[in-house]
Amino acid sequence: RLVGSEMCIRDRTEMLSRYEVEMEHYSKIINIEALTMLEMARKQLLPAINAYMSEVANTAASKLAVSEHISVRSETKTLEKLSSDADAMSDAIDTLQDAVNAAKALPTESEKAVAFHDNVLPVMDALRAAADDAETICGEDYWPLPSYSKMLYYV
């Protein structure tokens, strides 16, 4: 038994084996989270943002059809911000997919775990930040996921 070990590890080989198993487990968890995030962003969030942007653009066009003197500043600002968020999400989706593929291609479990931690998690955070910002702008009826306020209210 190694000194200080609470898991009754008998020797260095067993310790390294357990380490590799833990690194593999970590990598698999982050991989699943990243793939889930990619699917949600591609199939739910970006389409919702685009649908809401279309609605806002149609509203602006309708207002301008009535009179060129009607302001569409609010709609323009909303479209600019959502477009920026959608672009950031799209870029993060591409970067995240590349980072996941690169991490999965590494030869050892410890290298994969480090790559998932150092390269995948930061891109997941960036994608999340853009999606969180878009959520605050999109109309409630368009957003496909429960909002933070609804989740807190119903807890």
How would you label these PLM feature ranges?
Residues 2-8:
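Short, small-residue-biased leader/transition segments that mark boundaries at the very start
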Residues 40, 44-51, 55, 81-95, ...:
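Charged, amphipathic alpha-helical oligomerization/scaffolding segments
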